[in-house]
């Protein structure tokens, strides 16, 4: 078959291949791909074959690769190449060759009907692609023609083979449509055409499915074909007969999975809710599966119960609103709801004995939303019917959330335990949501059950039952304000009565107390009921996460009521810290808890507690500072510094972030004298410097030191002022010796908080000039090895311009060198560094008028900046960064318009810049668009996105849709 040759480069293959795209070379490359043990050779072969598939020669070798004497792998490649040529390069096929191409594909499909199935499928996909490209004008009755041609009696292939080939073709046609690259307007036309053609497909499918003589393989294929077609949003009423046939096929174990898929796909179409009469006919069909469902559950047949549950949930979840509206059919819908309830409460533990119940959870959200969306009168009626259902749901969910016996749980794999944990979180979310429907009565219900369980003397209760009820409370209290609930005092009273003999139960008790910490803040008299439990649990490593996080919540929420317990809390915490019971992260949380606790004490008390709390660590740090650096003492140093920084993160006597009401703040006198954190920092400052002197070349230790001061600065704000001069001096020495990003980040914090204060400007200016000078030297030596430093440096410069532009007025600051280094940073491969550099320029350019040195350097070197930006847009930088470069263009246009209008024309003049794919007209249009837009930043971003796609040859491709 003749083919018009494609233009060179149409395939996008890049440089000319070393080998010609011939049948022989393709076969050799395929052999290399499948059988060569060398991975590099495989990759080369794959790359070459991808080029071959899109080459003009593919039209010639594809047909030859389909010859009967070739092995299936080679035939498959030939069929795939045909599909790629037809689907991606349709415009290269002359219209007068459509018919011969169609005929050849039909011939090949007929031949492969009794051959390799994978090759047959690829050929069917190729013909489907051709049909979609020709419909509706060039091939108006494509589907009907396919059916007619394959039903012809004169075919050499047996009837069953032809039937299966036709069904394969009809199955892949809608699938190919869903993934096709058809333009949007064509997609609409073809969808309409396919909807009409459905009339040629469904009668055939019905006939084949209902014929007793149809073999199982044919009926299986019919169901898959139906499943594929319903996703074209075929009207549900047109599918009635096939859906009923699919329900009947559920009794056949071989057809069960395909039937489920077909029914679920048909029911789940968004358009299906319009066909209420059909939906109502489906309810009895679904309810008719209940006996099969019960049998499956009884026999442990998880596949069958899972499939039937999917069908029930698909109908209920997708159409609850439409079915609720049919008031006269309320009983049949309620029966469906109860069937789904059975699926939610299916016996056994998830995920070991069953995997079905999790499918139903979203249904309960949907049903509740739909009920609550009705107007008040109608809602009241439905609430009357469905509130008892939702109370039953709570019981079912809490039963499903119960842990298995300790013995059984011990046999579960770690993966099964993790799946069960996630399942319980999903149940927790559902319970929290159900609270909206049931309100305070739900908490009363849970409390009554727990009370009866704990006070009953008749029978011993299982810890699992207690744990599940507490878990229900915790789920609701964590996210919903229960402060006005009248059952919480009783619950707090019940908690100490729980006999805790199990880690899971103890964990849930802890998390429940934590969830009630805000309530405890409003009812401080109850703190003493639960605090001893929490402090006792701190000593158990198995309860590490729950006990520490609960103590942290109590200390944060109730700190003004904790002074009477402070000594005990500090003593217990010190004890567990010294015994090293907890992992590092929990130790850090514990220090944060103590920071909250100490914040509410008198200054003298804080200092006393701080002394006893951190003295052992200071002594340990003094000892470590004398030792020769090694990996083990490094870990100890980082741990101690981490403990201090976490303590100082939350120790805030000025209550900057406090949202408590005035009366509670008045409990504390206004603090006099220096801040306790500053007192401690000044005491340990020399020691920290000593540690630093030995560990200056270790980024982790430097980072840990900087973290102490950075977190203290963020918490203390102005109270940190006494430390500013000595910290600036220390940072300067640190950074001069070995530059580290963390030192720059801390400098940025100091600039942000203190640079605007005249008293602190001199030391901060000196530090700023020093780190700038050191970093500029680093740029001369090779900054590419330090993207983190460059990133932090750019952020520091931007902060300086934003907070205190006067820092750029100093004659000792080489603004020109800073500007050039920032331009260089724009070309880094690391996205965060590029982003930070763009941020610097968007802060710098608006200062052109007010800071003389900035205006001068922009005038001299601004063209260099523009070229770097255009190079990035032209393809040098990631497309995800285009908004950042657009911000620079916008700033240039807004603040340096006359310069930009001259530079942009000059910069875009050279052919091939910033991309060889651009025409002079496209470049001219872009420059005019940019220069015109000085107000709307969003429009500039859109222009840049459009232009970068043109530069990269991606405009009008599939990439554009996701961009």
Swiss-Prot record:
A Pfam short name: TPR_TNPO3_IPO13_2nd
Domain Importin N-terminal: 45-111
Ranges occupied by HEAT repeats: 24-54, 56-88, 95-135, 142-179, 194-231, 236-268, 276-325, 330-372, 375-438, 440-476, 487-522, 524-558, 562-600, 603-648, 676-716, 720-754, 761-803, 815-845, 860-893, 897-931
Alphabetical list of InterPro entries matching this protein: ARM-like (IPR011989), ARM-type_fold (IPR016024), Exportin-1/Importin-b-like (IPR013598), Importin-beta_N (IPR001494), Importin_beta-like_NTR (IPR051345), Importin_rep_1 (IPR040709), Importin_rep_2 (IPR040944), Importin_rep_3 (IPR040520)
Predominant location category: cytoplasm
GO biological process assignments: protein import into nucleus
Tissue specificity remark: Expressed in fetal brain, heart, intestine and kidney.
Recorded GO MF terms: small GTPase binding
Subcellular location: Cytoplasm; Nucleus
Family: Belongs to the importin beta family.
Protein name per Swiss-Prot or TrEMBL: Importin-13
Naturally occurring in which organism (per UniProt): Homo sapiens (Human)
